[in-house]
UniProtKB/Swiss-Prot annotation:
InterPro entries: Aldolase_TIM, DeoC, DeoC/FbaB/LacD_aldolase, DeoC_typeI. It is an enzyme of class 4 (lyase). It catalyses: 2-deoxy-D-ribose 5-phosphate = D-glyceraldehyde 3-phosphate + acetaldehyde. Keywords: Cytoplasm, Lyase, Schiff base. It comes from Acholeplasma laidlawii (strain PG-8A). GO terms for cellular component: cytoplasm. The gene is deoC. Belongs to the DeoC/FbaB aldolase family. DeoC type 1 subfamily. This is Deoxyribose-phosphate aldolase.
Length: 222
């Protein structure tokens, strides 16, 4: 297994410099990670540097709380694509999920999927705030709305992905969607276990440490 090909090498903290982004990009190229995941303001720069390297550019929409209107998320998505984004990680309307508002959740996700024009869309459901029934509910709606992935976390909640989250999502989506585990992945062993349980992608800012078999200190943004 080539662990590097599962990793979205991520830098989404509130204080990020151009130097930080260039380091992220350099590491992604060196280790051939699947993508770099950066805030929208860095997409064009990342795209220009990653052209021809095989590393994708991923960005976030409705980040970090998912409280943007669907039309705003759609606009963000279109602009990100213009800047060069290959993949979109959107934060779902978590309140709509917790309220079991099927219409709101579907409208939210569909707005981004439509705006993405066939590009990969990962729906961040923020599992830290959901119980198993709610995780199942939103995961199934994400599939119906045309999302490519269900993603566990933003990095701004009380915790990241757990093995239990991955198992619950996998049971809900089967082979109809992929799964991205984000956060809570502090070692190579953690990463391999997430993959074993159904994760197809790993979101982490500790990708270099993971592939080297080192343990992250946990003070990272994923």
């Amino acid at each position: 297994m080539k662990l590097n090909t599962y990793i979205d090498h991520t830098k989404l903290g509130p204080i990020v410099t151009l130097s930080d982004i260039d380091t992220l990009i350099d590491e992604a190229i060196e280790h051939q990670f699947k993508s770099v995941c950066v805030s929208p303001i860095w997409v064009a720069h990342a795209k220009s540097r990653l052209e021809g390297t095989g590393v994708l550019v991923c960005t976030v929409v409705g980040f970090p709380f998912g409280t943007h209107l669907p039309k705003v998320k759609a606009f963000e998505t279109k602009e990100a694509i213009k800047q060069g984004a290959d993949e979109i990680d959107m934060v779902v309307d978590v309140d709509a999920v917790r309220s079991k508002d099927r219409s709101r959740v579907s409208k939210d996700i569909k707005a981004v999927v439509k705006a993405a024009q066939g590009r990969t869309v990962k729906v961040i459901i923020e599992t830290a705030y959901l119980d198993k029934k709610q995780i199942t509910f939103v995961s199934k709606l994400a599939v119906k709305a045309g999302a490519t992935f269900v993603k566990t976390s933003t990095g701004y909640a009380s915790r990241g992905a757990s093995v239990e989250d991955i198992v619950t999502i996998k049971k809900a989506v089967g082979d109809d969607a992929l799964i991205k585990a984000s956060g809570g992945i502090r070692s190579k062993e953690d990463a391999l276990l997430m993959i074993e349980k159904g994760a197809n992608r790993l979101g982490t800012s500790s990708g270099v440490k993971l592939i080297k078999g080192e343990t992250s200190d946990g003070n990272t943004t994923y």
